[in-house]
A protein has these predicted regions:
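Secretory targeting and sorting signals
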Residues: 1-29
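N-terminal low-complexity, Pro/Thr-rich disordered segments
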Residues: 27-37, 56-57, 62-86
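Disulfide-braced loops of extracellular cysteine-rich modules
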Residues: 36-40, 45-47
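Extracellular disulfide-bonded cysteine-rich modules/repeats
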Residues: 47-55
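Surface-exposed, glycine-biased beta-strand/turn segments
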Residues: 77-177, 184-186, 212-213, 222, ...
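Zn2+-dependent peptidoglycan hydrolase active-site motif and core
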Residues: 158-204, 226-238
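Acidic, glycine-anchored pre-beta loop/turn
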Residues: 203-211
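Short peripheral tails and domain-boundary helices/loops at the edges of structured domains
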Residues: 236-285, 292
Length: 311
């Protein structure tokens, strides 16, 4: 959710506490059919039954899963991030290598963009990057998604071919379009693997729609008031998966799942954007390419929605 780069850090600690509480393991009486849950698609084993978090009547609740559909590691979960397919064909925006002559990288504006500044240097630093990286650490909090800053009105496009399995409205009054890869069926309220296009407005798809890579899903969100004042919006992209044996949501680094035919061009694009931003801002400390492996990943750890990482 790239919390470290989208809100002043004075609010960050409180949000982290709320997130941690929201997804803490529920191995108690609260985990029962009909009780509230927090992440669609997560399945837990309680007693002799499996419970799955699904959306019913506009709310997320635990429901009992029939024995035909959820035993062990079948459609409800995967063993590890190694089971996530390499299917990503773009970064969620129509990006190109940075062109110093135009100051743009496809739909992203690089030259002439000035990030917000604050009296607190830590807040200023948190807003300093035009692309947020998976595994970035802000006040000890790991970021589980990537973030891209782009002009207001910029189209968000599907990263892959697949099915829209979830489309929740978020706390920020915008949306997340969550797409299961081609060949994976939706479960009620989600899927074991979901590629996230998070914080977009004016969604153009609905749950159940088949989408193609490059298809417009919506528009970059304007919810970040400090960037909005600069004429800029944002989108976060990530990959969620339900890990067998765990009842918390997990994320892996998106850049590990690029389609082989697109990997070279996509990594070149991201490298050129980072280098372009360094040049425009005249600040070599904004990105360390050597610290990213692959580009876009500052860690290979899986990260939970409580912003903690585990290998």
């Amino acid at each position: 959710m790239r919390l470290g780069s989208i809100m002043p850090l004075t609010a960050l600690a409180a949000v982290a506490i709320l997130l941690a509480a929201a997804v803490a393991p529920a191995a108690n009486a609260a985990t029962k059919p009909g009780a509230k849950c927090t992440k669609a698609g997560v399945t837990v084993h309680v007693g002799n039954s499996d419970l799955r978090c699904v959306k019913k009547g506009g709310k997320l609740v635990w429901v009992k899963v029939s024995s035909e559909g959820a035993s062990g590691e079948n459609s409800s979960s995967i063993t590890s991030n190694a089971s996530i397919p390499k299917v990503i064909q773009n970064w969620g925006l129509a990006l190109e290598p940075y062109d110093a002559a135009t100051g743009k990288a496809g739909v992203m504006q690089i030259a002439g963009v000035t990030p917000p500044t604050f009296s607190n240097p830590a807040d200023t630093a948190a807003y300093s990057r035009i692309v947020g990286l998976y595994g970035d650490v802000v006040l000890g909090i790991l970021e589980p998604q990537m973030a891209f800053i782009a002009p207001l009105g910029t189209p968000v496009i599907s990263m892959l071919d697949g099915t829209v399995c979830d489309l929740p409205q978020l706390y920020s009054n915008d949306y997340s379009v969550r797409v299961a890869p081609k060949g994976m069926a939706c479960m009620t309220g989600g899927a074991p693997i979901l590629f996230e296009h998070e914080h977009l407005i004016s969604p153009l798809v609905k749950v159940g729609d088949k989408v193609r890579a490059g298809q417009r899903l919506g528009t970059v969100s304007d919810y970040m008031s400090n960037w909005k004042a600069k004429g800029m919006g944002m989108i976060e992209t990530g990959v969620f998966f339900a890990k067998a044996g765990s009842n918390v949501p997990w994320h892996a680094c998106l850049a590990n799942y690029l389609a082989p035919s697109k990997k070279s061009s996509m990594t070149n694009v991201l490298t050129s954007i980072e280098n372009g931003w360094i040049a425009v801002r005249n600040d070599p400390g904004l990105y360390s390419l050597a610290a990213q492996n692959p580009i876009g990943c500052l860690t290979q750890d899986d990260i939970t929605d409580s912003n903690t990482g585990v290998k």
